[in-house]
Design a protein with these regions (language model features):
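Residue-level signature of mid-helix packing/kink "hotspots" within the transmembrane helices
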Residues: 58-66, 148-149, 257-265, 351-352
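Cytoplasmic helix-loop-helix junction between adjacent transmembrane helices
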Residues: 107-144
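Helix-loop-helix hairpin linking two adjacent transmembrane segments in secondary transporters
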Residues: 140-183
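C-terminal membrane-cytosol helix-exit motif in multi-pass small-molecule transporters
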Residues: 173-192, 381-389
């Protein structure tokens, strides 16, 4: 076992926590391609209620995920995660037993109240060493992407056989599996990761809201997920109108998602190697906008929809993969957790607002107008992102620090920031820890440890 590889405990943590994440997100995503079709038998069905039901989890999750993360720091990660999964399972059962779209919406809101994302990520950080933490997070990130693709396959198949109720019952079962994994398979944490790396602080978030570059990214992820839920309010029904039966929708979704991933990877590699990240970012927002505009024109053609969705998901995948890394690079060294907390809340809020927008436009106008509205959202994002600044590549590390006084903390911060490769240094006396944003090519860890009095 080398220092550059995951140890057995980290591998176990990565796989088990990624599984919990995937089970939960699979349950949330499975509804997107089927509710607009199979929800028509529910009492009170209307496009605006479909949009509300699809996005309701986003509102409650946006509100509760940061408090749940803070609570996990006080009473323990496993308790909060298991409690959240129980609430998620209860919400799934409420929705499964519902005979009206309003009660389905209540169930979806309850699902979102099981807001365990922050606690899960903090737990993953607790169970991994500083230098291995990005790998563990990457495994979790991949599991979320895979769960979306699998949901596009599984949702239509399950709903075709057992209806909307079947989707929610399966979601409840997955939540129970998640509880088993957390209680039986996830290792117990011996240490806690630095708070600045993992947990959001409301006071820090208030300060970061004013940061122009972070504000652009928060607005961006909100608008990105707004477009996603907007189009899925009407897309499944439109595919049926165009002649693609409901249980065959995955014939379109899976090839599109697979090809979109294959096309996105070289774009990302070239953008990073050639240092053209901003150009690729702006280009992806433009591609997303154009794809939705084209969709509004080709809405009566399955082939046209497939081509537009391919372009949309190439852009979506690139932006979804790029923005968290940009947030980490831009965020102040000791406030990464708060920056990511604000970013995640914006993402969930976007899912809610997208459902509302898609439902309202579908109910008051036409399907074409829904896609045109999504294109307008993309245009607004393009304007917001135009002056975005991409910072130099960096990463954040933290060091335990022995501090005698506030003056000592300020002196140490000045000494650390003067070291080669240190872009920013923040010393937090309350935590006895120093957070460094560094250029890995120039930074000498032993030199920093020596200045901090660790060797």
């Amino acid at each position: 076992m080398t220092a550059s590889s995951l140890n057995s405990r980290e591998k176990r943590a990565a796989v088990s926590l990624a599984s919990v994440f995937a089970f939960r997100m699979l349950g949330l995503f499975m509804l997107m391609p089927v509710l607009a079709i199979y929800g028509q038998s529910l009492e009170g069905f209307s496009p605006i209620w479909i949009g509300f039901a699809i996005g309701a989890y986003g509102l409650t999750q946006a509100v509760l995920q940061i408090p749940m993360g803070r609570l996990s720091d006080k009473i323990g990660r496993k308790k909060v995660i298991v409690g959240g999964l129980i609430v998620f399972a209860i919400g799934s059962v409420v929705a499964a037993l519902a005979d009206s779209i309003q009660m389905v919406t209540v169930g979806r809101a309850l699902q979102g109240m099981g807001a365990i994302a922050s606690a899960l990520l903090a737990f993953a950080s607790d169970l991994s060493r500083d230098e291995q933490r990005p790998k563990v997070m990457a495994v979790i990130g991949m599991s979320i992407g895979m769960s979306f693709a699998f949901a596009m396959l599984l949702g239509p198949i399950v709903a075709a056989s057992w209806g909307i109720a079947g989707v929610f019952w399966l979601t409840a079962i997955l939540a129970v599996f998640g509880i088993f994994i957390v209680t039986m398979l996830v290792p117990n944490a011996v240490n806690k990761a630095p708070k600045g790396d993992t947990l959001a602080s409301f006071s820090d978030i208030k300060k970061l809201i004013k940061h122009p570059q972070l504000a652009r990214l928060n607005a961006g992820v909100l608008l990105l997920h707004l477009t996603l839920t907007t189009i899925f309010v009407v897309l499944p029904s439109q595919l049926i109108k165009d002649g693609l039966v409901a249980d065959h929708h995955w014939y379109l979704y899976i090839p599109v998602l697979f090809l979109a991933f294959l096309l996105m990877v070289p774009i990302m590699i070239v953008a990073i190697k050639k240092e053209k990240e901003k150009q690729a970012f702006i280009g992806s927002v433009a591609l997303l906008t154009i794809s939705m505009l084209a969709m509004s024109a080709w809405v009566n053609s399955v082939v046209g929809i497939a081509v537009c969705m391919l372009l949309y998901f190439v852009a979506f995948n690139f932006l979804e993969a790029t923005m968290p890394a940009l947030v980490s690079r831009i965020a102040p060294a000791s406030q990464k957790g708060s920056a990511m907390g604000g970013y995640s809340s914006s993402q969930f809020l976007g899912a809610f607002l997208g459902g509302m927008l898609g439902g309202y436009v579908a109910q008051t106008t036409t399907t074409q107008a829904v896609f045109a509205a999504a294109a307008l959202v993309g245009l607004i994002w393009l304007i917001i992102a135009w002056k975005m600044q991409v910072p130099p590549k960096s990463k954040v590390i933290s060091l335990m620090t022995k501090l005698d006084s506030e003056e000592h903390a300020q002196t140490l911060a000045s000494q650390l920031v003067a070291l080669p490769g240190v872009i920013e240094a923040t010393v937090v006396r309350d935590e006895n820890r120093s957070y460094l944003k560094i250029n890995d090519k120039e930074f000498d860890l032993d030199q920093a440890r020596k200045v901090a009095g660790l060797i």
